[in-house]
């Protein structure tokens, strides 16, 4: 991935704690170029899918105390991703604001809906409870999906709803969720020529 050039819808956030070190750069008007290394291979796979299908240029570099478990690194990366997304959105002028997507993956079907509203909220439904203790790819507990999506929604100040309609394979469920969010975000942040230079809200602010 080439170095990002300054743009009007670019976010860059670094965050370091005693548990992790995270850098996220993203360009909302990219072409899906991704450069991901979180030291958690399945999470790399999911963030690659997210950046690709959102058509964001996305760079993520994370390291942390994965010798304990992946929780801190995964959640902290989601926090910084949300902050970078919020930064890239700026004043939210001229965006479509709302987006949703249905994503099938073999036996799985997932749906995501996004409102770039400035109001942080996340609702997740339909995930099979028996998978909450299931680990994918060696060190990615399935239950971390909830932490990731809630952290993204809270720190980007978006309203995010994610539904699993049906599915049996935890990998397929997680991947369909990430791709549905990606496509919903892509639609929501897309410029709307009819709202050019205008905040898409009756309040005049988001």
Curated annotation (Swiss-Prot):
GO biological process entries: L-histidine biosynthetic process
Cross-referenced InterPro entries: IGPD_sf, ImidazoleglycerolP_deHydtase, ImidazoleglycerP_deHydtase_CS, Ribosomal_Su5_D2-typ_SF
Pfam families noted in UniProt: IGPD
Sorted UniProt keywords: Amino-acid biosynthesis, Cytoplasm, Histidine biosynthesis, Lyase
PROSITE patterns: IGP_DEHYDRATASE_1, IGP_DEHYDRATASE_2
Source superkingdom: Bacteria
GO-annotated cellular components: cytoplasm
Family, as annotated: Belongs to the imidazoleglycerol-phosphate dehydratase family.
Stated name of the protein: Imidazoleglycerol-phosphate dehydratase
Species this protein is from: Saccharopolyspora erythraea (strain ATCC 11635 / DSM 40517 / JCM 4748 / NBRC 13426 / NCIMB 8594 / NRRL 2338)
């Amino acid at each position: 991935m080439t170095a990002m050039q300054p743009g009007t819808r670019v976010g860059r956030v670094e965050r370091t704690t005693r548990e992790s070190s995270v850098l996220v750069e993203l360009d909302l008007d990219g072409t899906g170029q991704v450069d991901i290394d979180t030291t958690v291979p399945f999470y790399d796979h999911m963030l690659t899918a997210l950046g690709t299908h959102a058509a964001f240029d996305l760079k993520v570099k994370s390291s942390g105390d994965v010798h304990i478990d992946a929780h801190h690194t995964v959640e902290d990366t989601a926090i910084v991703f949300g902050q970078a997304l919020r930064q890239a959105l700026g004043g939210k002028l001229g965006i479509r604001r709302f987006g949703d997507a249905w994503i099938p993956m073999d036996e799985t079907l997932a749906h995501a809906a996004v409102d770039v509203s400035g109001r942080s909220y996340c609702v997740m439904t339909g995930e099979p409870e028996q998978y909450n203790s299931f680990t994918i790819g060696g060190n990615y507990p399935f239950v971390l999906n909830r932490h990731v999506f809630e952290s993204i929604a809270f720190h980007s100040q978006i309203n995010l709803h994610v539904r699993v309609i049906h599915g049996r394979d935890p990998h397929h469920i997680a991947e369909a969720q990430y791709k549905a969010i990606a496509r919903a975000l892509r639609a929501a942040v897309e410029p709307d020529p009819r709202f050019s230079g205008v905040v898409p809200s009756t309040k005049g602010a988001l």
